[in-house]
Amino acid sequence: MQNALLFKSYVNIFYKGLKETDNFQNSNYSWHLDKLISSTSQDLELNLNYKRNNQPVCRFLDVAIKNVPASQSNISSSLENLKNKLNWQVNDNYQNIFSNDFFENESFVEIIGPTGLLICPNIRIGLLLLGKNVFYPSHKHEALELYNILSGTSMWQLFDNDFEKQNPLDNIFHDEWVPHAMKTIGEPVLALFSWSGMINKEAIPI
């Protein structure tokens, strides 16, 4: 319980820092951060039904946590303490559509949210883990989404635009229904993700 609460505290501080320093050209991005800050400022109940589960890509988790920059050591240390308690998942909507290689090299975990380790009904906060040289095909969802790259270099695409390089500490915001794709280039990628808005509707492949 203590490790989960520390994670909640650290991401709360992290999102407050983004709110203070980012220039908001998108009002939904500002609203999203407000929702994250408000929700992680509250007392949250421990989910007694939360069960540990691993996926094949978890073979990269240790090195991905180790590669988190020192400036985010609070988050990486809390993840180190939580890593053996996490329920890693895959999106069932992708079954029989994405390749077997994708499912060997992608997974996400919800730490705060309706089904997270800490229960919160109106946001989802967790991790995305991608293996080496994996392509995550274009997909979209109604929820607002923010990715904060913790470790690894990757390429990200919005709509049909060119892929752009994203490095550790970069932030990527996806408005509702914006198609996006990503691919890794020789190293695993660990990212903090957050959802707000229509969080109970899963992502769908395009």
Roles of regions detected by a PLM:
Residues 1-6:
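Intrinsically disordered, low-complexity terminal regions of plant proteins
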